[in-house]
Amino acid sequence: MNLPFRAMVSDLDGTLLTPEHLVGDLTIDTLRALEQKGVDIILATGRNHTDVSSILGKIGAERAVMITSNGARVRDLQGNLLYSNSLPEELVLELYKTPFDTSKVCMNSYQDEGWFTNKDIPAMRQFHKESGFDYNVVDFSKHHGRGTEKVFFIGKTPEDLVEVETYLRDKFGDVTTIVYSALACLEVMNKNVSKGDALKHLLESREYELKDCIAFGDGMNDVEMLSWAGKGCIMKDADIRLKMACPELEVIGSNKEESVARYLRTQFGLDY
C-alpha cells in the first residue's frame, strides 16, 4: 500500500484533544484506522507519560509512541524508555531559586517520581481529568532535583511571565531550552530538548525519515517538529507566535472540530 506518510505526529492540547482535553470519537476512529494501515502514531506533548498513557489507552493504538515533556522522554505504550534527556540536578536546584510573584505565578516540575508544584491550584486538574494525573505540593527550597524532565512556570496571564522569562534567559539561556507550551506556560528543559529532536532520535531506529512524517501542533514547543516534518500543519487557534515563526506551514481548522482527524482522513483517503 502506497501511503502518503509513514507516521502521524501530533501535539495534544489545542491540537488532537478537544477543548475539554478529551479524545473525540472521530479522532479515535481515525487513528485506529491509520494504525491498521501501518501508519505509526506518535503523540508529542508537554505532558507527562502517565497522562499520555491514559489517552493512548482510550485510542487503542497498540504500537503508539509517546514523546513527553516536550521531548525530554520517549516511551512506547508499554512504558519502556526509548530516550531520555534530563536537566542536570545541580541546574534544577538553581532553577528552583527563580524569583517570581507567588500571587500570580506557580512553579512546577515533572520528575521521574511525578508532578510537583509550589501551591495547590485545583483548576490545573482540568487538563488531566482524563488520566487522573495529579500534583504533589512541595517546598521547592527543600525539594530534590533528581530525574527532572522539565521545570515550568504557569502565570495567571502571559504578562505575569515576562520577568520570569527575562531572568531565565539571562541566567540559564546558554544551558537550557526555554519555550512557551501555552500563552501563559513557560517551560525549561535541558539544552537541545525539543519534540523535533526527540522525533529525530526515535527515527534513528525506524526505516523512514522526518520527510515521511506529517505533524500537527499549536504552540511554540512545536516549532522544530512542524518545521522538520515532511508536512507540518498549524491549528487555526494556534499561538500567533507559532504562525509568525512558521509562515510557510499550512493552517488547518480547530481542535473543536477535530480538524486533525478530518485532515488525516482526507490525506489518507479514509471514508466517514
UniProtKB/Swiss-Prot annotation:
Alphabetical UniProt keywords: Hydrolase, Magnesium, Metal-binding
Residues annotated as binding phosphate: L12, T45, G46, K195, N221
EC number, as in UniProt: 3.1.3.-
Cofactor(s), names only, from the UniProt record: Mg(2+)
Gene3D superfamilies registered for this protein in UniProt: 3.30.1240.10, HAD superfamily/HAD-like
SUPFAM superfamilies: HAD-like
Binding residues annotated for Mg(2+), in chain numbering: D11, D13, D218
Catalytic site: D11
Gene Ontology MF term list: magnesium ion binding; phosphatase activity
Pfam families xrefs: Hydrolase_3
Superkingdom of this protein's organism: Bacteria
Family of the protein in this entry: Belongs to the HAD-like hydrolase superfamily. Cof family.
PANTHER family with a match to the protein in the record: PTHR47267, PYRIDOXAL PHOSPHATE PHOSPHATASE YIGL
Stated name of the protein: Putative phosphatase HI_0597
Species in which this protein is naturally found: Haemophilus influenzae (strain ATCC 51907 / DSM 11121 / KW20 / Rd)
Organism ancestry: Bacteria, Pseudomonadati, Pseudomonadota, Gammaproteobacteria, Pasteurellales
